[in-house]
């Protein structure tokens, strides 16, 4: 079986797992810089999979390392945000937010659940690639000064230093199975701008 077939097979295998993770995270949202339980939960999932990780990076951030053959050869990072927004959920679904006035309205539950699934796939395939994949679970994306800058000050981009970082954001107008990308910065946030 070639690597593409193995990836597809593992993606099918972990699809129910990723849905389960997304629904759990959706049901238990936490605001920016308050992601205590979210961080613990994500760490427990990494631990259960046997994936090396470190908690408390820049507050509630987590960094996981999936080391392939020759782990120092090259390093690539994947990043997902994990905070929610101060919005009351109106959806009527079995996994509706249990935290009044807080919900995952921006897809960060999907981002974190997807990265958990990807980390497991990469862990299963670690004998097939060279280098290290650094999985970054970022707190505080929705609030200034932003969890990324705090994680950077706490050394997230060192030991090992990634040559590149990839992030994702769900985008409902794209059909399932499609990926949109462009060069340069592209992510948005709910920052406010005051013109005086």
List each language-model region with its residue ranges.
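Acidic/His- and Gly-rich active-site-bordering loop/insert found
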Residues: 3-104, 113-129
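Histidine/acidic-residue-rich, glycine-tolerant segments that coordinate divalent metal ions
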Residues: 85-87, 92-103, 110, 127-196
């Amino acid at each position: 079986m070639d690597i593409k077939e193995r990836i597809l097979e593992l993606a099918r295998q972990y699809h129910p797992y990723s849905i389960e993770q997304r629904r759990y995270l959706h049901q238990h949202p936490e605001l920016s810089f308050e992601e205590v339980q979210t961080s613990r939960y994500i760490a427990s999932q990494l631990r259960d999979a046997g994936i090396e990780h470190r908690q408390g990076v820049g507050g509630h951030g987590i960094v996981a390392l999936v080391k392939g053959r020759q782990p120092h050869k090259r390093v690539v990072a994947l990043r997902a945000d994990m905070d929610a927004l101060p919005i009351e959920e109106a959806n009527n679904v079995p996994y509706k937010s249990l935290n009044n006035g807080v919900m995952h309205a921006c897809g960060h539950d999907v981002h974190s659940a997807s990265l958990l699934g990807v980390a497991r796939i990469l862990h299963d395939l670690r004998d097939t690639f060279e280098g290290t994949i650094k999985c970054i679970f970022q707190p505080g994306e929705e609030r200034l000064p932003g969890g990324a800058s705090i994680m950077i000050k706490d050394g997230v981009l060192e030991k090992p230093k990634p040559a590149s970082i990839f992030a994702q954001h769900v985008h409902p107008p794209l059909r399932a199975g499609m990926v949109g990308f462009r060069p340069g910065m592209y992510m948005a946030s709910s920052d406010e701008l005051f013109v005086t």
